[in-house]
Amino acid sequence: MKFEWDTAKATANISKHSVSFDEAATVFLDQLALSGPDPDHSAGESRYITFGVSSLGRLLAVSHTYRPGGVRVVSARRVTRLERKVYEEG
């Protein structure tokens, strides 16, 4: 799977959430990852949110959209307590 993102947004995401988009992309390798639509953040394009464990062992929430040939990462952060529960309950 090919990933893309805006480099300025990626830098800002590290400052704000301490999560790189390179790490965020590894969430999609988690066989237990959960994905669904994110209608609250879909103004102008359909966005999705995926909860999964990264290659660094952190449970992350990754906001993304699908583009021809791949996935565009929009933001990434650690999950909230409620999101952790959703992931753990599968």
Task: List PLM regions with ranges.
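Ribonuclease/tRNase effector modules and their secretory precursors
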Residues: M1-G90
